[in-house]
Swiss-Prot record:
An annotated GO cellular component: extracellular region
InterPro entries xref list: FAD/NAD-bd_sf, GMC_OxRdtase, GMC_OxRdtase_N, GMC_OxRtase_C
SUPFAM superfamilies according to UniProt: FAD-linked reductases, C-terminal domain, FAD/NAD(P)-binding domain
Species per Swiss-Prot/TrEMBL record: Leucoagaricus meleagris
Necessary cofactors: FAD
Protein name in UniProt: Pyranose dehydrogenase 1
Gene: pdh1
PANTHER family: GLUCOSE-METHANOL-CHOLINE GMC OXIDOREDUCTASE (PTHR11552), GLUCOSE-METHANOL-CHOLINE OXIDOREDUCTASE N-TERMINAL DOMAIN-CONTAINING PROTEIN (PTHR11552:SF201)
GO molecular function: flavin adenine dinucleotide binding; pyranose dehydrogenase (acceptor) activity
Length: 602
């Protein structure tokens, strides 16, 4: 979760409107009129985000195939700020490279509407997220495999593919890395750069002392990506060995040949039947904006929709694929009647808690740090989040009201992500009503994002009209189920135990948010309804299901049910949120889909 754009962000985004093409082979076009005539594309990918660029890159490995990617946002090359790891928190809602969605008012959140950041730039959310690299638990993958009916997505089957895609960049004997990860669970020859966090501040020693005192609740975890993430350990990031963000745009697209064409600043509005009235959806319609002419192109083989958890169901519904009564209400003719389209939105609810401490601030001069990074790719902006640790907590059974929404016993219910709050670069979705430190503060104001990894409330994406340029209605249905608020309540109490430990006795003064006297269930629930936000890890709006199932939108081969020539590959097909930040699962699903597609054409 990232906050609204800051003055710093606006200044940085204006630094480097470079206007250069993607390096190496892929060819970028800024306007539909610039596309070359007479080119027959084998595959057209609707959306140049995390998944879309993986698919385009992998399919382009067959030099006989031509691939077109159509992306609504600009090239990532035009946004210098996205390259700098330490400035990730300045992106998101309010940014010119974000869609700037908001949800409808949430009944469970005192009627509040929430920001719902989604990237509008080449590389998608891998270009503007927090870069955290987590795989989830092996239970998540086995759960998905069982739901979908494809054991190829089970943990033991998918792990080699995950490792194949990864390029871990650090020397394991380096003291800044040694003891932070387990080399045996990583890959070294893939496209996506991954590195372990490092920092040398007093907070680290205190935090890891809690793994001794409170080992049952916060055991030390060497590597959270081994399939059993429960515990406290070091964060891993998609940052390369030059201290730059690694995204699908930088790691996959930049290694393609010239058989990939990329059209930016252009929205895919619909997929169309190639015959005009059938179920063979191999044609796309696209336009620059609502007032510009719409153009069409037909793929020789397939159209692959990769717009993400919000845009992909919007594209399908505008194309006549969805629930008949919903489409009729906005004047869209139904071609494929499927009530599952846009349903099953699974996301992670989160809140921020803050502690006043006597620890020294890790704040720094942003301008000086930016100069250092620009000159040498070193300094505080060469890293990801300010405090480089994650904790995954599994709650005891007696705190779950007789329910266990997790994927299994290896799976946590809660995540803590740590940060320092500063006036210059706020992080992790600091609520507007939360206290912020003074600009001259020399003490660390510690923040934890407390995340419910397995919210069982399900939301939806729907249309308000039949204009593809109108934003869809996003309903998270937050706290529809009581267990979701109960888990966050227990997460706050767990955080309190961590920072009331002996290790922090002389360093942490008190809760400042929520107030220290908010201890009852009723007080904490009121706090949560007023402060909870989305961690923006939504999945499931075009959920995958077994072939022949009466529910779901795509089959295990990623083909849209009832159609030919049309697949969906992105977060929308994942049945439920994992115990993870979702970028790695999206990469893995995209790698898996790419192999299936290529194999289907031998």
């Amino acid at each position: 979760m990232l906050p609204r754009v800051t003055k710093l962000n606006s200044r940085l985004l204006s630094l480097a409107l470079l206007g250069i093409q993607i390096a190496r082979g892929a060819i970028t076009y800024q306007h539909p009129d610039d596309l070359p005539s007479g080119v027959d594309y084998d595959f057209i990918v609707a959306g140049g985000g995390t998944a879309g660029l993986v698919v385009a890159s992998r399919l382009s490995e067959n030099s006989n195939w031509k691939v077109l990617v159509i992306e609504a946002g600009p090239s990532n090359k035009d946004a210098f700020v996205t390259r700098v790891p330490g400035l990730a928190s300045t992106l998101g809602a309010g940014s010119p490279i974000d869609w700037n969605y908001t949800t409808i008012p949430q009944d469970g959140l005192d009627g509040r509407s929430l920001d719902y950041p989604r990237a509008k730039i080449l590389g998608g959310c891998s270009t503007h997220n927090g870069m955290v690299y987590t795989r989830g638990s092996k239970d998540d993958w086995n759960s998905w495999a069982g739901i979908i009916g494809d054991q190829g997505l089970g943990w033991d089957s998918i792990l080699p593919a995950i490792k194949k895609a990864e390029k871990f960049t650090q020397d394991f004997t380096d003291q800044s890395v040694k003891g932070h990860i387990d080399p045996s669970v990583h890959g070294f020859d893939g496209k996506l750069s991954v590195s372990a966090a490092y920092s040398n501040i007093s907070f680290n020693d205190l935090l890891f002392e809690t793994t001794k005192e409170l080992n049952a609740e916060f055991p030390f975890k060497l590597d959270m990506n081994d399939g059993k993430p429960i515990g406290l350990g070091w964060t891993q990031y998609t940052i390369d060995n030059h201290a730059e963000r690694s995204s699908s745009a930088t790691s996959y697209l930049e290694s393609t040949g010239d058989n990939v064409h990329v059209l930016v600043n252009t929205l895919v509005t619909r997929v169309l039947s190639a015959s005009g009235n059938g179920t063979d959806f191999r044609k796309v319609e696209f336009a620059v904006d609502a007032n510009s002419p719409k153009k069409q192109l037909e793929a020789k083989k397939e159209v692959i929709v990769a717009g993400g958890v919000i845009a992909s169901p919007q594209i399908l519904m505008n194309s006549g694929i969805g629930e008949r009564k919903v489409l009729q209400a906005v004047g869209i003719d139904t071609l494929i009647d499927n009530p599952s389209v846009g349903k099953n939105l699974s996301d992670q609810g989160a809140t921020s808690v803050m502690f006043d401490t006597t620890l020294p601030s890790t704040d720094f001069d942003v301008d000086a740090a930016l100069t250092e990074w620009t000159n040498s790719h070193t300094g505080p902006l060469a890293r990801g989040a300010r405090l480089n640790h994650l904790t995954f907590v599994r709650l005891p059974d007696d705190k779950l009201n007789g329910q266990d929404p997790s994927s299994g016993k290896n799976s946590p219910h809660i995540e803590f992500q740590f940060a320092q709050i500063t006036p210059q670069v706020p992080t992790l979705g600091v609520p507007k009503q939360a206290p912020l430190p003074a600009a001259n503060s020399y003490r660390l104001l510690l923040q934890l994002a407390v995340v419910n990894l397995y919210s069982i409330s399900r939301g939806s994406i729907s249309l308000s009209d039949n204009n593809p340029f109108t934003y869809p209605l996003i309903d998270l249905n937050m706290f529809k189920e009581d267990i979701d608020i109960a888990i966050l309540r227990e997460g706050i109490r767990s955080a309190g135990r961590m920072f009331s430990s002996k290790a922090f006795k002389n360093s942490v003064n008190k809760f400042v948010y929520p107030p220290a006297d908010a201890t009852s269930d009723e007080d904490l629930d009121a706090f949560l309804r007023s402060s909870t936000f989305s961690y923006v890890h939504g999945v499931g709006t075009l959920s995958m299901s077994p072939k022949g199932a009466s529910w779901g939108v795509v089959n295990p081969d990623f083909k849209v049910k009832g159609t030919s020539g049309l697949r969906v590959v992105d977060a929308s097909v994942i049945p439920h949120a994992p115990a993870a930040h979702t970028q790695l699962p999206v990469y893995a699903f995209a790698e898996y889909a790419s192999a299936l597609i290529a194999k289907s054409y031998n």
